[in-house]
Amino acid sequence: MIMPKKERKVEGEEVIRVPLPEGNQLFGVVEQALGAGWMDVRCEDGKIRRCRIPGKLRRRVWIRVGDLVIVQPWPVQSDKRGDIVYRYTQTQVDWLLRKGKITQEFLTGGSLLVE
């Protein structure tokens, strides 16, 4: 009796959906690390928000200046404060650029997003 060969998964080829901002969430680029889990983030609406990194994200992800993130503005002081919800990897940023969700100018500090 001949048995079929097992299919082997090639490492690094795992398909993961790229999360996009939902509801009132925004794209943002980290401008400055302030310490104690706080960062200044330039958001897609042109405002600079002081955002905190929630504990569950702080323990798992290292966020640096220049990283593309998703920001959830707070219900109170929504144009000044927010939470960082997700950090994109470089591969995910490249995919967002190819699909036209963000522009290179937004990442480098120029104009805002493509709608």
Curated annotation (Swiss-Prot):
The gene is eIF1A. Keywords: Initiation factor, Protein biosynthesis. This is Translation initiation factor 1A. PANTHER family: EIF-1A (PTHR21668). SMART domains: eIF1a (SM00652). The keyword Nucleotidyltransferase does not apply. HAMAP family: aIF_1A. CDD domains: S1_IF1A. One of its GO terms (molecular function) is RNA binding. Pfam families: eIF-1a. Seems to be required for maximal rate of protein biosynthesis. Enhances ribosome dissociation into subunits and stabilizes the binding of the initiator Met-tRNA(I) to 40 S ribosomal subunits. Residues 14-89 form the S1-like domain. Belongs to the eIF-1A family. It comes from Pyrococcus horikoshii (strain ATCC 700860 / DSM 12428 / JCM 9974 / NBRC 100139 / OT-3). The lineage of its organism: Archaea, Methanobacteriati, Methanobacteriota, Thermococci, Thermococcales. Gene3D superfamilies: Nucleic acid-binding proteins.
